[in-house]
Amino acid sequence: MEFTARHNITTVLTQNLVAAGDNAGSINSVHLANVHASDDVNVDLIVNNSGADYYIIKNVTIPNGTSLVVDTSEMAINTSSNQDSLRIKLSAAIPVDVIINNRK
C-alpha cells in the first residue's frame, strides 16, 4: 500500500492509519483533532505487530473542537513489510481528523 498522511475517521471500527508494508519511515507525531461541534470522543492509538496490540494511548478523551498531538519520535514503529501497523479506534462515530508527521 501507499502511505497516506491525512485521514478523516468517522467510525468506531478499528482503522489502519499506516499498514505494515506502507514503508512510512519514522513516524514522528500523530495529530488528532476532534472536529465535532458538540461531542467529545475517546481515542485509542495502537501499534499492531503480528496480531498483538500495543497501546500508545488508550481511552484518552479529546473534547469537541480540540486537538491532541502524540509524540511518537522515540518509538520504533517499523512499517516495512510484515512489521508494525498504526491503528486508531474511536469510542463513538465522532469525526476525528488525523495528520501523521513522518520522515523517510
Tell me what each language-model feature is:
Residues A37-K58:
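Short, surface-exposed beta-strand/strand-loop-strand elements in extracellular ectodomains
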Residues M1-G25, S29, V35, S81-Q83, ...:
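C-terminal interaction-tip segments
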